[in-house]
Amino acid sequence: MVTNKMTAAFRNPSGKQVATDKVAEKLSSTLSWVKNTVSHTVSQMASQVASPSTSLHTTSSSTTLSTPALSPSSPSQLSPDDLELLAKLEEQNRLLETDSKSLRSVNGSRRNSGSSLVSSSSASSNLSHLEEDSWILWGRIVNEWEDVRKKKEKQVKELVHKGIPHHFRAIVWQLLCSAQSMPIKDQYSELLKMTSPCEKLIRRDIARTYPEHNFFKEKDSLGQEVLFNVMKAYSLVDREVGYCQGSAFIVGLLLMQMPEEEAFCVFVKLMQDYRLRELFKPSMAELGLCMYQFECMIQEHLPELFVHFQSQSFHTSMYASSWFLTIFLTTFPLPIATRIFDIFMSEGLEIVFRVGLALLQMNQAELMQLDMEGMLQHFQKVIPHQFDGVPDKLIQAAYQVKYNSKKMKKLEKEYTTIKTKEMEEQVEIKRLRTENRLLKQRIETLEKHKCSSNYNEDFVLQLEKELVQARLSEAESQCALKEMQDKVLDIEKRNNSLPDENNIARLQEELIAVKLREAEAIMGLKELRQQVKDLEEHWQRHLARTTGRWKDPPKKNAMNELQDELMTIRLREAETQAEIREIKQRMMEMETQNQINSNHLRRAEQEVISLQEKVQYLSAQNKGLLTQLSEAKRKQAEIECKNKEEVMAVRLREADSIAAVAELRQHIAELEIQKEEGKLQGQLNKSDSNQYIGELKDQIAELNHELRCLKGQRGFSGQPPFDGIHIVNHLIGDDESFHSSDEDFIDNSLQETGVGFPLHGKSGSMSLDPAVADGSESETEDSVLETRESNQVVQKERPPRRRESYSTTV
């Protein structure tokens, strides 16, 4: 069923219409093929229900069922026999509708025959409003397939998920796989005339394909014949694949929907574009890949079920191989399998993975409780009938499965890598087996040759040849021995010239290797000596046998002499080989020592090179560090200069500030002194000396208090009695009399503002003396001014001044 939204998306403005002209053209070819297929089935059913009032006609264009004597609107007027006959006809109509091929024929005849009351009643009961909408919708999709496929592909997929209407399935399948106009369709008739090597296999398996379906169950029926034709034609087109049993079910489903030529084209397209060709190859490599991917999906989504399958040795191929080979056609009934095949035509093998995993998810609880045989029975008997009548439930469950195409590609690469390694191992095993077989054959040949060798008349000639060869080999051995001796001497000289190695561990390892070689050489030497000893014993026995035979004929004596000489030569050859073996052993020892020394030299050279590189690296690093150090020193000097400049600037600013503060304080002191002088002069003029002295003492006490506040010191105790005022100012003209410290200068400036108390400092002193009674007011003012000038300290130098003394007595 389709929704109103999808129906509106494809509905044309003219309203409902059953089918367009293009759909009718597509259906005409299908209906022409249906008539021959259904004719014998319809005739059999017609013979069972034939009566004067009912007739069954089979024509070249359609199959028509009519009951002119019956009226569905007046059932009460019919006799019991007529009612029974009508019931049988309705039953036969239902049977025809369940047949996928007969349904198309009957519906086509109903559209062409408006006079059949049975057809009209069946059509009115089976076609609902939604089915008519589906017909209109799919008719429009088929007419405008190219535009719809490009612009509304997603909506088309959703409609396919809901199911393709039966009458449009043949056309839509051809459109989905693009099999409408294939050149191979013209070759079909020629292929049928040819002979295929797979004909016997196809004939044998045809009876097993849909054995319960009416179209294929009878031997040599039309269905089996067209199935044989399609399978034979494809086996000739693709000789590598030939014929595979599972492919017959797919072809059979196609033949239920369309004529054999169109079914052949669709099948060729499926094999080429839907991975079916790789599935049906003799190696079935693609089937192994699908099994691996499906097993990985089970392991990811259903780990508990996967573990249960592994514990029961229930392999994936035991139940899922037929799913991929037949697209569930041998698993589910045809209505459900056809729905799955609709989606397969649209989306490919993805639907097989989805449906398979959905089946396992829905049956996980039951499968977990069964053993291997029980699970096989469950897959064969229970699962196929779980969704009878509810195929939408299975489709919905399938599309709830998580399917990751990128992960499937990754699994495909992993499977390819695994198979490549297996192929390499198989090739290696095959090569080893072949080599083993050849060696066995060679051993057998040598054993046969050894057993069949006998003394004959040519033995003497053979001995002479062997004697010549032995002499030649002896001469070659002597030359080789001399060369080896020269080589040994050369190696000894080079060995003596090489420096010793102090690495004890490496020497011990090499010594062990040399001792092993020496032991092997000693064993070989012992074997040679044993051989020489055996030859000598053999020679002695031979001499013992031949001592009493001097009377033998000359020919035999000559042969004996040759044998003796040959034995002697063999003894010499054995001795020579022993010497060569010893020389080779010495040469091997020398070469070993040479190799050891070469290794030592190479390691020493490598160490020297590495040390040189390290020295170069360290020198470069040292240069870089020196450069960084010089740069750091330069930056440090610059920073120090800047700091000094900043300190000097700060000190200059501080000196200026201190000088300004001193000047201000000195100016304040001058003003206060002038004020006090004015007050003192006024009071001297108005009051007597005793009263003034008391007031003056009070003022002096206040000034002392202010001075202590300014200096943060305690007031002086024990003031001398004042009978008069004596102000003395001593000025020292030396430069040393001035303090360099700004704080001392400030303290002195503050002390100089006091009157009548001792002032301690280097620049001068001020005291109150009661004995001093003479003086004038002008002299007092001059002394104060001189005191102020003497205590002004600035940064520039002043010339030395004379010492002056002023006294004022009241």
Curated annotation (Swiss-Prot):
Summary of subunit composition and partner proteins: Dimeric and monomeric. Interacts with alpha- and gamma-tubulin. Interacts with FBXO5. Interacts with the chromosome passenger complex (CPC) which is at least composed of AURKB/aurora-B, BIRC5/survivin, CDCA8/borealin and INCENP.
Entry GO CC: centrosome; cytosol; nucleus; spindle
Taxonomic lineage: Eukaryota, Metazoa, Chordata, Craniata, Vertebrata
Disease tied to this entry: A chromosomal aberration involving EVI5 is found is a patient with stage 4S neuroblastoma. Translocation t(1;10)(p22;q21) that forms a EVI5-TRNG10 fusion protein. TRNG10 is a probable structural transcript which is normally not translated.
Renumbered residue ranges of the record's region Dimerization: 128-693
Keywords: Cell cycle, Cell division, Chromosomal rearrangement, Coiled coil, Cytoplasm, Cytoskeleton, Nucleus, Phosphoprotein, Ubl conjugation
Residues in Rab-GAP TBC domain copies: 163-348
Protein name, UniProt field: Ecotropic viral integration site 5 protein homolog
Tissue: Expressed in various cell lines (at protein level). Expressed in a wide range of tissues including brain and adrenal.
Induction line: Down-regulated during mitosis through proteasomal degradation.
Region of interest (Targeting to the centrosomes), residue spans: 377-810
Gene: EVI5
